From Swiss-Prot:
Alphabetical UniProt keywords: Ribonucleoprotein, Ribosomal protein
Biological process, per Gene Ontology: translation
Coiled-coil annotated spans: none
Protein name per its UniProtKB record: Large ribosomal subunit protein bL36
GO cellular component: cytoplasm; ribonucleoprotein complex; ribosome
Gene: rpmJ
Keyword Transport: no
InterPro entries, per database record: Ribosomal_bL36 (IPR000473), Ribosomal_bL36_sp (IPR035977)
Gene Ontology molecular function: structural constituent of ribosome
Family from the record: Belongs to the bacterial ribosomal protein bL36 family.
Source organism superkingdom: Bacteria
Keyword presence, Ribosomal protein: yes
């Protein structure tokens, strides 16, 4: 899980979701997991 000020989809399988007001990226590739800090 990467915590970044700006999250962007890295590949086509990355999905942008919102959980408890936080923007997150979920993907098949675990390296692509991000959340906005």
């Amino acid at each position: 899980m990467k915590v970044r000020p700006s999250v962007k989809p890295i590949c086509e399988k990355c999905k942008v979701i919102r959980r408890r007001g936080k923007v997150m990226i979920i993907c098949e590739n675990p390296k692509h997991k991000q959340r906005q800090g």
